Amino acid sequence: MSDILDRIIDVKRQEVRAAQQSAPLEELRLQASTRDLRDFVGAIRAKHEAGLAAVIAEVKKASPSKGVLREHFVPADIARSYANHGAACLSVLTDVQFFKGSAQYLEEARAACQLPVLRKDFIVDPYQILEARAMGADAILLIVAALETSQMQDLEAYAHSLGLAVLVEVHDKDELVEALTLKTPLIGVNNRNLRTFETSIDTTLGLLDMMPDDRIVVTESGILSRTDVERMRAMDVNTFLVGEAFMRADEPGVELARMFF
């Protein structure tokens, strides 16, 4: 792992230990039992069946590489804007230290619309998956670069047992081989190298030949313009996770519609 990713994972393990003391598993299970589920994969497929791009629109205040992206940050307003302009799903950052996110942001965003929501965080422990279900998430992210294959398989199985969808994230061919051992149809290709934080959308295009037909390719990071979108769609990549381009716009949903529709 990179120094940056290493540091993030160390913090996550510390956070899990602290959270287990303040919110025991039984408490989370009770919270999770009161939450409804929305069909994350189904929402993506519905867009595809209509001939449209499926946009997983991100609610993201900041990032380690770019700093604060949006000073006026109201998750509920952002979520409504996305929902009103054609997003398929939401992705909400819940990492506090590195991305200035929170569980509360996810809860506020989900309550403001009917879209399924991905908890965007660095998952290293089953506790975080139950935590995601308890806060109202419909899907979680698993990052191949952060996990051993057997660990990832166990985490996926637990997520699916709770009814959560799984987006597995890769950056290169070796990681894709590992990701394809999972059952999830959602394969995210992060165009940002987590080792260097450099970005190139060629990363997604370079992995398409290895992608089975039964998987849905989600291109992540570096999609900043309509030209980027058209380039991807010309190669039959029709699912996008986009944050920065929307967060920097005055009206995130309007920017979404301008880029995609």
Curated annotation (Swiss-Prot):
Catalytic activity: 1-(2-carboxyphenylamino)-1-deoxy-D-ribulose 5-phosphate + H(+) = (1S,2R)-1-C-(indol-3-yl)glycerol 3-phosphate + CO2 + H2O
Pathway membership, UniProt: Amino-acid biosynthesis; L-tryptophan biosynthesis; L-tryptophan from chorismate: step 4/5
Keyword hit for Lyase: yes
EC primary class: lyase
MF-aspect GO terms: indole-3-glycerol-phosphate synthase activity; phosphoribosylanthranilate isomerase activity
UniProt entry tagged with the keyword Lyase: yes
GO biological process terms held by the UniProt record: L-tryptophan biosynthetic process
Keywords tagged on the record: Amino-acid biosynthesis, Aromatic amino acid biosynthesis, Decarboxylase, Lyase, Tryptophan biosynthesis
Documented EC number(s): 4.1.1.48
Pfam families given in the database record: IGPS (PF00218)
Record-linked PROSITE patterns: IGPS
NCBIfam families in UniProt: PRK00278.1-6 (NF001373), PRK00278.2-4 (NF001377)
Homology family: Belongs to the TrpC family.
Protein name as catalogued: Indole-3-glycerol phosphate synthase
Native organism: Paraburkholderia phymatum (strain DSM 17167 / CIP 108236 / LMG 21445 / STM815) (Burkholderia phymatum)
Gene it is expressed from: trpC
